[in-house]
Amino acid sequence: QISESENITKNYADNLINSGDIEIGILKNSAKDKIGISLNDLTKHMLIVGTPGSGKTTFSVSLLDRLWKEFNIPFLVIEPAKNEYRALIQSIPDLQIFTPGKSFISPFVFNPFVPPENVKLETYKSTLKTAFAAAVSMSTPLDKIFEEAINNCYSDFRWLDTYTSKDRGGIFNIADFIQCFQNTFDEIGYTGDAKNIGRAGVVRLRSLENLFDNYYSIPIQDLLQKPTVIELAAIENSDQKALIISLLLLSILAYVNSNYVGIGSLKNVILLEEAHVLLDATSNVGQGDANPSVIARNLLKRMLAEIRSYGVGIIVADQSPRKVSTDVVALTDMKMVFRLVEATDKQIIADSMNMNEMQEERLARLKPGEAFLFFNKLDSPEEVITPDYRIQNNIDVTLSDQDISELITYWNDKMEKLKPYPECEEIVYCKKCCCYERRILAKEIARRIFVKNFNKGMKDFEVIKGVFAKISRLTKNELNDEEFSQELLACVKVHLWRRIVYGTGIGVNKRIIHNSLRKS
């Protein structure tokens, strides 16, 4: 193919100029020629970088929107810092949006201890260990305790290494795992510094309870079969964000390895926005600790290397190529580079794209929407002008929480899956769904009642009898202006029973708990 501009004639590979599946933009040196790519080019992965306001996100939105509407290629966006992809629902009405940290909008119900479909436990246990290590620094012996606790917990719930989630192993959640971690630690009998490290591990795990406080888990295939956005902006803790991202990426990799056939044609696109949130997970790293950022970088490198043959393209997006590391930059074949001003960033990109000196200097002077494109079908980077897709297609920069809560549909036919605990099945008021506002209130009331009446070393069952004999009055005493109801009381009982089971030394038979709740 040939493109002619003012005084330049260039030869290009086929299916690039005024052709291709996806149009990237207009060649800067041509008044009319457009450059495009084929779908399968994306299986070799893509890097999109640029400073805020340079057009990076607008381009990403346009790419994803066209992939779904024109080619029925589903995408998954993992968005750690902003809420800019939610507005795609204006163009894609069945867009799935999940908002961990803002469960009142669209809960992200994820139980990391449930293996993805058709993934054997033996494989998945290593996934769990890698994901936690990529997000949380684990001093020795914490890493060994964690590994042993994983083995013990699955064993306690009657799993075998050959089982998948369809077999008969019992489902457990983060509270069960913390209890198993504590028991494993106590059985080993560490002393001194090792004992303090183990206690710190329990505290660290308890900080994750609100993230994974459920037994059901959204199937990985649900996230891959339709356009999906997972927003993490409401989670303030960077380690927690990194953990969710690590668990998601590794669960996807395990699922794809077990369920996809490697024929190479594009099936899915995964966009990891603000990738440095995962790759910079270095908080509280001490001497002798496994460095989470190194593990996370290796995780992403492994995914980039393994998943392409299954037709899954990964797009890594960030403001700075320096923050995603040169090795990740090197593993993405296609590069779309908007305005960059920092010297190291420009140097990394220039080296990776075979730029000449003029092109490198030009990076800092690019206007919004202008970018350099480079991949294996080009001999040198091409400067392109990308369309202002959001304005052209009436897609807002973002939408309010209220707007999104009214538009999302994922949970409409799955309301019963929002019940967090097995004990909820005993409550007659909760057969079809779970009222989130009531659950939050009941959980806090149960916490207050527990703190005032129980302690960790308590073993006297008579205390439980005394508390439950006056549970209605105790619940009413903790209300502010909220209305008391039998529905609320039943929910308080569920949360209080769970606190007793996991927070005291009182052994309680499950039958007693279930009988108590059935009377609610």
Describe the residue ranges of each PLM region.
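Conserved ATP-driven motor cores of ASCE-family P-loop NTPases powering translocation/secretion/packaging/pilus
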Residues: 54, 62-65, 114-116, 287-288, ...
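Generic beta-strand/beta-sheet core signal
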Residues: 5, 25, 40, 49-51, ...
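P-loop NTPase motor domains
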Residues: 62-305, 309-312, 366, 371-377, ...
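Conserved P-loop NTPase motor module
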Residues: 5, 367-520
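Short acidic loop-to-helix transition motifs that present clustered carboxylates
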Residues: 30-31, 42, 82-83, 237, ...
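Glycine-rich phosphate-binding loop of nucleotide-binding enzymes
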Residues: 16-101
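An aromatic-glycine-centered, glycine-rich loop/turn in mixed alpha/beta architecture
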Residues: 1-18
